[in-house]
Amino acid sequence: MLAQLSDPHIRLGDRAAADALRTAVAAVAALDPAPDAVLVSGDLADTGDPREYALVRDLLQPLPMPVHVLPGNHDDVAALEAAFDRPVEYEVDAGPLRLVTVDTTIPGEDGGRIPVDRLAPRLNDPKPTILAMHHAPLTTGVPAMDALGIPLADRAALADLLAHHPHVKRIVSGHLHRAMVGALGGVPVFTCPGANLQLALAFRATGELPTNDDPPGYALHLLLDGEVTSHLVPL
């Protein structure tokens, strides 16, 4: 079982963000049975300050299982790698699942891209796989969100790649601060709600990303009968 947290946006002096992540960590740490690992799918820090990552590490410390991270558009990749002492792209086992992370960030931009050529050789292990990236490779119907997403050409290239890798059972993402379900080339795409603020559904083009009072949450991904089942857990 893989637990997924996303988008805590920890900022120095922001007690509410720290408390929200602390609550999420406590909930995951108390799960029985315990997850095999935890994924934090981007925007760990709000400004990319190295001191924010030190705080994130402290807040994640109560988790007794391995914690895996990947960068979001608010993160500084070099600072994140230094804080967690590992590259942001890696392949690792999480119980019966294989977790493959992809860095979709573009320095200085909020949108993303998928480095398909770099990803292709990393998918050769036939173990049931979850592909994790910050930006979700789907169209949400919310114009302000879609403006900060993945280009269609990149999504098409990824779909072509996944057609040759049927062991990729799920794509999981963050970035959107809402739980959503879609698909890319027949592979289900799941977006995790934020551990902090949630974004409102604004289907009309406003140019803004308003928040709302929806509860934060996390996700659990389980391999059952050869397929991945994902659960949304509100906090």
Describe each PLM feature range:
Residues L2, V38, V67-H68, E91, ...:
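Residue-level marker of motif borders
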Residues M1-I10, P96-I106, I130-M133, V187-P193, ...:
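Active-site-proximal beta-strand elements of phosphoester/diester hydrolases
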Residues R22, L161, M180-L235:
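Binuclear metal-dependent phosphoesterase catalytic core
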Residues A26-A37, G111-P188, G217-L220, V228:
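His/acidic metal-ligating clusters that form di-metal
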Residues D7, V38, D43, V56, ...:
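Divalent metal-coordination and catalytic microenvironments
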Residues M1-L59, T140-P143:
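N-terminal active-site segment of His-dependent metallophosphoesterases
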